């Protein structure tokens, strides 16, 4: 037995959900699902005034190849501050109400990966946290 829900209906009516947290684990250069366009789509699907958009972002991809991104597969290796730029862009959306990061251990474990360390510094600055 399969169950489906009508996302457009749920996001158009009050009483179903308070927020939606789509897993936007895509970079800006992802050939299949570019981050900006995908976030814009989710934001535009929300018609009810009380429903908030909280994008889930892929911290774990920093410094790694994304084979599913096709021509954008090396973005997470070559580009800097992707997560910080995604948060900045997300903040421009009318339904934005925060973000989540996946995975905890990639953020808070001491890392030898310079890209991860640079992203953490960028995030701390963006979020006005102590920049030790």
What kind of region is each of these model predictions?
Residues 8-31, 48-132:
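Substrate-binding cleft of secreted/luminal carbohydrate-active enzymes
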Residues 2-5, 35-39, 82:
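Charged helix-capping and loop-helix junction motifs
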Residues 40-49:
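Surface-exposed amphipathic alpha-helices with a cationic face
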């Amino acid at each position: 037995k399969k169950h489906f829900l009508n996302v457009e209906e749920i996001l158009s009516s009050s009483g179903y959900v308070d927020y939606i947290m789509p897993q936007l684990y895509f970079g800006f250069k992802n050939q299949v699902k570019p981050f900006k366009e995908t976030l814009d789509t989710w934001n535009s699907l929300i018609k009810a005034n009380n429903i908030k958009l909280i994008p889930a972002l892929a911290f774990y991809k920093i410094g790694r190849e994304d084979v599913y991104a096709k021509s954008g597969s090396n973005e997470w290796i070559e580009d800097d501050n992707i997560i910080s730029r995604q948060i900045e862009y997300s903040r421009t959306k009318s339904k934005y109400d925060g973000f989540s990061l996946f995975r905890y251990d990639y953020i808070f474990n001491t890392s030898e990966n310079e890209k991860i360390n640079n992203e953490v510094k960028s995030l701390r600055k963006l979020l006005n946290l102590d920049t030790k």
